[in-house]
């Protein structure tokens, strides 16, 4: 009976070690493996007129592209309310917005907010896009499976 107990204990220990190794390996997928697992799509809300929030959103977009690979992630930044001000031609972050657009980030302005603030496309940065309603765009993206981020 004493010879059976160490064999059973040893077998149980081996099963436990194998389980831990299997789970640990699965948890340590590389970013490239995660990117190939399916589409990475992120919609970001910027509704604050705070320069810091815009810089944070642009940093998040850059970091997502750096970690996952720009070809492996689709990013859309939706600006509405007070956040729309940073998309105007005189924006303090105009050069960073241009860099993000060049790298493939989609940046859109809410036309409802533009009407409320009496802004025309000629008042805005030339390369941005437009959506009818920023909150509806965010809602629809989430319904389509996009991850939501609000910096």
Residue ranges and their predicted role:
Residues 25-151:
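Secreted/extracellular ectodomain signature
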Residues 2-15:
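Bacterial N-terminal signal peptides that target proteins for export
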Residues 13-24:
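Bacterial N-terminal signal peptides
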């Amino acid at each position: 009976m004493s010879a059976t107990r160490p064999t059973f204990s040893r077998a149980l220990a081996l099963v436990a070690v194998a389980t831990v190794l299997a789970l640990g390996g699965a948890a340590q997928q590389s970013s490239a493996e995660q990117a190939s697992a399916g589409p990475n799509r992120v919609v970001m809300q910027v509704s604050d007129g705070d320069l810091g929030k815009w810089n944070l959103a642009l940093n998040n977009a850059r970091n997502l592209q750096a970690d996952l690979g720009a070809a492996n992630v689709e990013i859309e930044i939706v600006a509405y309310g007070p956040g729309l001000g940073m998309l105007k031609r005189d924006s303090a972050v105009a050069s960073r917005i241009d860099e993000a657009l060049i790298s493939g980030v989609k940046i859109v302005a809410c036309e409802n907010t533009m009407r409320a603030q009496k802004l025309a496309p000629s008042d805005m940065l030339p390369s941005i896009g437009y959506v009818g309603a920023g909150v509806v765009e965010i809602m629809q993206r989430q319904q389509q499976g996009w991850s939501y981020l609000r910096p």
